[in-house]
């Protein structure tokens, strides 16, 4: 096994051939064995229109933990805030767009979901509930902003933010596994779901090195994985002997394995599952 050169290597439509994926759950359009729950749960009901992919539905059921308060101020908790933890120059922190022939860029849906498709038509994700017919703008916040416009709250500073006060556009959406458009529809959900990646072995060894007092060696292992996430492998914020600690390590685990069902295990291992 070896690390892929590109960040998307372990997740492509042909990731069954990836040298980094050590164990995966098979998904194949032709055989009808589709692993599509991430698409169904992360995406808005009308996200299929933005993707320009017909025939699939989604439940608007999940999004990333917010990084910002309703008034736009950042949360200051050391843990969590996943979208904010991605560096601005991280190639993954782009709006997801399918480019054709199995190629794509970005790993998230955020901002206004409106673009010109490969066929030249305008595609967009429009609202159904709080913002019916409007092009939705997905925000890194959770609050019922419509109630400020309607006069129920005088300002965003008064808005509560919890699991019951979201709107249909609340939260950043994760596209860890790629989604094609109608032109390449037979690729839909052909990505196997990675259960274990070789990058995880790097991170396990890095954590062991850190716990044994070898901070520099630990940092180097994290950086071997990190560098592919930046243009020309120039990492603007590498892990170093001086900035590595348990919080930086947990951030590295979170960012690299976001959406891969590791977070609870990692927090429990460090005794931080019930803290901020």
Where on the chain are the PLM-derived regions?
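An acidic- and aromatic-residue-enriched active-site/binding cleft used to recognize and process polar
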Residues: 8, 28, 230, 254, ...
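Bilobed periplasmic-binding protein-like "clamshell/Venus-flytrap" ligand-binding domains
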Residues: 255-269
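Short, mixed-charge amphipathic alpha-helical segments
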Residues: 235-245
């Amino acid at each position: 096994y070896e690390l892929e050169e590109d960040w998307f290597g372990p997740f492509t439509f042909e990731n069954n051939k990836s040298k980094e994926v050590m164990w995966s759950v098979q998904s194949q359009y032709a055989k009808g064995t589709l692993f599509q729950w991430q698409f169904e749960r992360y995406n808005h009901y009308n996200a299929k229109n933005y993707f320009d992919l017909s025939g699939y539905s989604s439940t608007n059921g999940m999004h990333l933990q917010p990084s910002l308060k309703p008034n736009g101020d950042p949360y200051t908790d050391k843990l969590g805030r996943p979208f904010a933890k991605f560096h601005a120059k991280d190639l993954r922190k782009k709006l997801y767009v399918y480019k054709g022939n199995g190629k794509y860029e970005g790993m998230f849906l955020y901002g206004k979901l409106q673009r010109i498709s490969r066929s030249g038509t305008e595609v967009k994700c429009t609202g159904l509930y709080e913002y019916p017919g409007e092009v939705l703008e997905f925000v890194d916040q959770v609050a019922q902003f419509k109630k400020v416009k309607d006069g129920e709250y005088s300002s965003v500073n008064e808005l509560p933010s919890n699991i019951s006060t979201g709107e249909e556009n609340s939260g950043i959406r994760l596209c860890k596994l790629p989604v094609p458009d109608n032109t390449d529809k037979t690729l839909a959900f052909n990505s196997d779901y990675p259960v274990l990646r070789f990058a995880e072995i790097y991170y396990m060894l890095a954590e062991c090195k850190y716990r044994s007092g070898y901070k520099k060696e630990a940092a180097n292992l994290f950086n071997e994985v990190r560098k592919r996430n930046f243009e020309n492998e120039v990492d603007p914020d590498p892990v170093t002997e001086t900035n590595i600690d348990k919080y930086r390590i947990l951030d590295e685990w979170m960012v690299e394995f976001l959406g891969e069902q590791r977070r609870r295990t990692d927090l429990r291992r460090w005794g931080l599952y019930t803290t901020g």
